[in-house]
Design a protein with these regions (language model features):
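Short, polar/acidic, helix-capping and beta-turn segments at strand->helix junctions
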Residues: 1-117
Length: 117
């Protein structure tokens, strides 16, 4: 995955949990998908969450909470379908929060908390 864009880590482990910083639709080579359709942005963002979890020694089935920020709440049905396929049978706590805008003009950002190990 691409290096963090600021003074932070993609993932931090503390007290048995892995905290995943807000992930954006940026490809591993650093390409920003701001002009891509929402669905493509969502898939890349969730892939970044999965990569950060793996790098921290955790996995999707250990997710506890997921926070999703979207710039258009009308994207909720599309996101929910992509998310359900991505997370599988796991059902962590989740919030989808509409926001007026995100960095670089992205349409989605996702942060998460998982159990370590």
């Amino acid at each position: 995955m691409a290096a963090p864009g600021g003074h932070y880590s993609h993932a931090v482990t503390a007290n048995g949990f892995v905290f995943i910083s807000g992930q954006l639709p940026i490809t591993p080579d650093g390409s920003k998908l701001a002009d891509a359709p929402f669905e493509q942005q969502a898939e890349q963002t969730l892939n970044n969450v999965a990569m950060a979890l793996t790098a921290a020694g955790s996995s999707l089935d250990r997710l506890v909470q997921v926070r999703v920020y979207v710039t258009d709440i009308k994207s909720w049905p599309a996101f929910n379908a992509i998310y359900a396929k991505w997370v599988g049978s796991s059902r962590p706590a989740r919030a989808v929060i509409p926001v007026p805008e995100l960095h670089y003009g992205f349409k989605i950002e996702v942060e998460a908390v998982a159990l370590a190990g």
